[in-house]
């Protein structure tokens, strides 16, 4: 299969070519992010973030990623070297993609109630997106329908008083 036949997420056209290279290799391998994560001893969310330039793999990650996807490690070493830094916060605002828009909509509709509950339980502060883990699960609802369960797990950071 040539790379020209691979359907790529639109956002990849705005990123350095290494990310299209990674996505193409993932498609050819028929591996999921969960499969790759298992090979790398990482969480699938973190691995997916690497594929969009939102996280920086360390050297051990690069070795495992190149082995998992049968890629030449030197390309990854060059791309993710000392000059690489993640570009977090990709995309349009508000998002146009239906999945991303629904996540945005959740925060628009339920953001203030969530903020209020965080303040009631923890005090004045924020949930870190730096000291953070996220997980996505497929679960069954009460009518046996497929449901998406997203867990956001961030360190609480109180605002400092001075």
From Swiss-Prot:
InterPro entries: Cyanase, Cyanate_lyase_C, Cyanate_lyase_C_sf, Lambda_DNA-bd_dom_sf. Gene3D superfamilies: Cyanate lyase, C-terminal domain (3.30.1160.10), lambda repressor-like DNA-binding domains (1.10.260.40). One of its GO terms (biological process) is cyanate metabolic process. Its EC number is 4.2.1.104. SMART domains: Cyanate_lyase (SM01116). Keywords: Lyase. The active site is at residues 102, 105, 128. It comes from the Eukaryota. SUPFAM superfamilies: Cyanase C-terminal domain (SSF55234), lambda repressor-like DNA-binding domains (SSF47413). One of its GO terms (molecular function) is cyanate hydratase activity. It catalyses: cyanate + hydrogencarbonate + 3 H(+) = NH4(+) + 2 CO2. It is an enzyme of class 4 (lyase). Belongs to the cyanase family. Catalyzes the reaction of cyanate with bicarbonate to produce ammonia and carbon dioxide. This is Cyanate hydratase. It comes from Mycosarcoma maydis. The lineage of its organism: Eukaryota, Fungi, Dikarya, Basidiomycota, Ustilaginomycotina.
